[in-house]
Amino acid sequence: MSTKVPIYLKRGSRKGKKEKLRDLLSSDMISPPLGDFRHTIHIGSGGGNDTFGDISFLQGKFHLLPGTAVDETQEDSGFEMPFQFTRTATLCGRELPDGPSPLLKNAISLPVIGGPQALTLPAAQAPPKPPRLHLETPQASPQEAGTVDVWRIPEAGAAHSELTTESGAEEPFLSHASSLLSLHVDLGPSILDDVLQIMDQDLGHLQIPT
């Protein structure tokens, strides 16, 4: 066979047997996609009407593209080339045409954050505040802040005495538990008396009569 034929199409060592193309090709011959390959620039057969991407290498010479050649008579008559939505056309300062651009006909613009669209959004309602337990208690003014504890203590004592007289002697513990302003803590038998007695005994032994 000719040397110009690719190596994967050449016959093997077996003679007289025609090999099929699917037997010669394998998936290992297909190179994986390159990570740095990007289709960022495209110039189609239509020339200026079929381009996108960064074509700044043209340096504004759009007449070099196929299909965009304009004769001198059209240039003198004031004929303008159609606007191309490319980076170069935008940087060159070419003005937008009055008519809608075919490239932007089906485009959908996203709302700008903080723009006029943001004013029409419904305001988020704040969550309801939890109920407070001290709403029923009177609020003291800053001038009476020092006397708050003075007039609250008799009120708590009066409520405690009223509950005690109503419940009677049969339920003394309920009167303490029903009052929110009173605190009843039972620490059990106190050992303070025992400690004081031991201290008195030690002092008695230390004092020797003269």
Swiss-Prot record:
Domain spans labelled CRIB: 30-44
Keyword Membrane recorded: yes
Taxonomic superkingdom: Eukaryota
Alphabetical list of Pfam families matching this protein: BORG_CEP (PF14957), PBD (PF00786)
Residue ranges of coiled coil: none
Record-level Gene Ontology MF annotations: GTPase activator activity; opioid peptide activity; small GTPase binding
Membrane topology: Peripheral membrane protein
One GO cellular component, as annotated: plasma membrane
Main location class: membrane
Disulphide-bonded residues: none
InterPro entries: Cdc42_effect-like, Cdc42_Effector_BORG/CEP, Cdc42_effector_prot_2, CRIB_dom
BP GO terms, sorted: actin cytoskeleton organization; cellular response to type II interferon; positive regulation of actin filament polymerization; positive regulation of pseudopodium assembly; regulation of cell shape; Rho protein signal transduction
Modified residues (N-acetylserine): 2
Subcellular location: Endomembrane system; Cytoplasm, Cytoskeleton
Keywords noted in UniProt: Acetylation, Cell shape, Cytoplasm, Cytoskeleton, Membrane, Phosphoprotein
Sequence positions bearing Phosphoserine: 31, 101, 141
Ranges for region Disordered: 124-145
Description of how the protein assembles with itself and partners: Interacts with CDC42 and RHOQ, in a GTP-dependent manner, and with SEPT7.
Family under the similarity heading: Belongs to the BORG/CEP family.
UniProt free text on domains: The CRIB domain mediates interaction with CDC42.
Record function comment: Probably involved in the organization of the actin cytoskeleton. May act downstream of CDC42 to induce actin filament assembly leading to cell shape changes. Induces pseudopodia formation in fibroblasts in a CDC42-dependent manner.
Protein's UniProt name: Cdc42 effector protein 2
Biological classification of the source: Eukaryota, Metazoa, Chordata, Craniata, Vertebrata
